[in-house]
Amino acid sequence: MSENHDRGLQVRREVMGDAFVDRALGNASEFTQPLQDFVNEHAWGGVWTRSGLPRATRSLITLAALTALKCPQELKGHVRGALNNGCTVEEIRETLLHCAVYALSLIHI
């Protein structure tokens, strides 16, 4: 595996927790394993390891994106990740509320 893959797997474990990552990797099939490798290398190893934003900020952005995309299962895991990254409950709540005004309410206008 590449250096980005290894760094990504480490960051993914730090953010999401070992149990979450072990479950994701353990549930991977021959068909989905390349997707797990891609996510580790490019999302976690390529984007989450960049120096331009603190991890807590990246977590809040991820929560906003998952809210806008209506991905409740992924959102649940990343709320735990945001807490692991030092985000407060208030910051998470305000991020979700702010995003909901734009991403969810506008579909009813």
Task: Please tell me what each predicted stretch does.
Residues 1-57, 84:
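Acidic, glycine/proline-rich low-complexity segments that act as flexible tails and inter-domain linkers
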Residues 9, 62, 79:
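Generic structural marker for isolated residues within well-ordered, non-membrane alpha-helices
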Residues 55-60, 89-94:
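Alpha-helical scaffolds flanking conserved acidic
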Residues 107-109:
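Conserved small/polar residues in nucleotide/adenosyl-binding loops
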Residues 72-93:
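Mid-chain, well-packed structural core segment of small domains
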Residues 39-43, 60-67, 95-100:
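Short alpha-helical scaffolding segments that buttress acidic/His motifs in well-ordered protein cores
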Residues 30-31, 67, 85, 98-105:
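A short structural micro-motif
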